[in-house]
Regions:
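Catalytic domains of carbohydrate-active enzymes, especially glycoside hydrolases
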Residues: 39-60, 165-169
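N-terminal amphipathic alpha-helix/helix-capping segment at the start of soluble metabolic enzymes
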Residues: 1-23, 47, 88
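Structural preference for beta-strand elements that scaffold enzyme active sites
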Residues: 18-20, 51-53, 94-96, 169-171, ...
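Conserved, mostly hydrophobic/aromatic
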Residues: 21, 46, 88, 97, ...
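Acidic/aromatic-lined carbohydrate-recognition and catalytic surfaces
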Residues: 18, 56-112, 145, 150
Length: 225
């Protein structure tokens, strides 16, 4: 059996050991979703791991559902991430960016008054995290096919920006009830077009997003959660 501290080849990544840090949202970015010096320090403190998967990173203004989570859709955000990736690399570790769109798990107060979007108009239960006074989630607006294609392109653009920011790869967040998972689940995907119905159709958005990331990074540096 290999020892925990022994090197590991994981796809196209060469890890110094077999310890991988899971993504953990900290909400320490600026109001403009720019990574901060505190974030660079936080990740550097954990860079004894062979690989760090970053906290979830929103791919657009529409993609967010929480306060002060970082993004990868502006030049300022790219510059902010550079201090993080450099701090991790200085410790001999690797870091990949987890790309994120929350879909219906948001609120108009976080989206400049716009409705959140999803596969179908199925409302998220409960109340929005950390907003005060407390607010219930609202029914999302179903995405048009052209908008699905546009979001796929936003995933690709975020992957390009991740490379510019010094990341070593990307991971697609497709779980935990967020947008891609909303398309995968028959309880939240009631569509009757090419993105709904069969398992193949419900997985179409996810697989197209994966292809978009591979176009930028190659298959060896793309993961799916």
């Amino acid at each position: 059996m290999a020892e925990l501290n022994s090197p590991l080849i994981l796809g196209g990544l060469h890890l110094k050991n077999r310890v991988v840090m899971a993504p953990l949202t900290r909400s320490r970015a600026t109001d403009e979703r720019v990574p901060t010096a505190m974030m660079a320090e936080y990740y550097a403190q954990r860079a004894s791991a062979g690989l760090i998967i970053s906290e979830a990173v929103v791919i657009s203004e529409q993609a967010n559902g929480y306060l002060n989570t970082p993004g990868l859709f502006t030049d300022a955000q790219v510059e902010g991430w550079k201090q993080v990736t450099q701090a991790v690399h200085d410790q001999g570790s690797l870091i990949v960016a987890q790309l994120w769109h929350v879909g219906r798990v948001s609120h108009p107060d976080l989206l400049n008054g716009a409705a959140p979007v999803s596969a179908s108009a199925v409302q998220q239960k409960g109340q929005v995290s950390l907003l005060r006074p407390k607010r219930d989630y609202v029914a999302p607006r179903p995405l048009e096919i052209s908008e699905i294609h546009a979001i796929t392109e936003q995933y690709r653009q975020a992957a390009v920006r991740a490379k510019e920011a010094g990341f070593d790869g990307v991971e697609l967040h497709a779980a935990n009830g967020y947008l891609l998972d909303q398309f995968l689940q028959s309880s939240t995907n009631l569509r009757e077009d090419e993105y709904g119905g069969s398992t193949e159709n419900r997985a179409r958005f996810l697989l197209q997003a994966v292809d978009a990331l591979i176009e930028v990074w190659g298959a060896g540096r793309v993961g799916v959660h």
